[in-house]
Amino acid sequence: MKQDQLLEYLEHFTSVTDGDRLAELIGRFTLGMGYDYYRFALIIPMSMQRPKVVLFNQCPDSWVQAYTANHMLACDPIIQLARKQTLPIYWNRLDERARFLQEGSLDVMGLAAEFGLRNGISFPLHGAAGENGILSFITAERASSDLLLESSPILSWMSNYIFEAAIRIVRVSLREDDPQEALTDRETECLFWASEGKTSGEIACILGITERTVNYHLNQVTRKTGSMNRYQAIAKGVSSGILLPNLEQVVVTNFPKLMQ
């Protein structure tokens, strides 16, 4: 694909605001790169037990139906690996990773091949607010390693823009379906110190407010995040990116080590 075409896709992915339009754009890009299908799973940690999962794909309907009906998401080896690494996953080398997979999970790939999904490359994606994505570009034939290796730099580059577009679209949809109040600065401060294991009394001393006020703010956080208690609110705060590490007092390690 020529450079001007790639830049055009980049602009489209940066500005797209509709899920169906995004699916169409990914499909066109996939074909232009020499692949037959794509499959893109976006996982948003609304809850550890029931995260929000959105699938964009251009795979055969028969495969989508079989995959969904047999609950293959939980045993999909691509999903398993993508949640543990950031490097691309080459389908024709999955056997080398078998020891890291659930027993029998490679059967999913054998079944996929029967439906015409025979080779591909998958990119694990990780967002700033705890989102996970897995974008796969797939061939109907057992493509040579040359195609996978030669196209992977461009696919990896563009995957990040596709990922950001999907997050933007899905997050807007979630806010429209279930609008949530934003946390105030003080609520975020209380949640931050609670995540550090501080009691309400200790947080009160740190922030110079009363313990009763701390409990009020943490109760507000619990309500706004739809949590059962402050511990679940902490988990949601960490997974969603509301809570971020404080970099003001960090100890920095340099490599190579600086001269004394």
UniProtKB/Swiss-Prot annotation:
Pfam families: Autoind_bind (PF03472), GerE (PF00196)
Keyword match DNA-binding: yes
Keyword match Cell membrane: no
Keywords of the record: Activator, DNA-binding, Quorum sensing, Transcription, Transcription regulation
Entry's Gene Ontology BP terms: quorum sensing; regulation of DNA-templated transcription
Superkingdom to which the source organism belongs: Bacteria
Chain ranges of the HTH luxR-type domain: 176-241
Gene Ontology MF annotations: DNA binding
InterPro entries (alphabetical): Sig_transdc_resp-reg_C-effctor (IPR016032), TF_LuxR_autoind-bd_dom (IPR005143), TF_LuxR_autoind-bd_dom_sf (IPR036693), Tscrpt_reg_LuxR_C (IPR000792), WH-like_DNA-bd_sf (IPR036388)
Start-end of DNA-binding region: 200-219
Coiled-coil ranges from the UniProt annotation: none
Known role: Functions as a BHL-responsive transcriptional regulator.
Family assignment from sequence similarity: Belongs to the autoinducer-regulated transcriptional regulatory protein family.
Protein name from the UniProt record: Transcriptional activator protein AhyR
Native source organism of the sequence: Aeromonas hydrophila
Gene responsible for this protein: ahyR
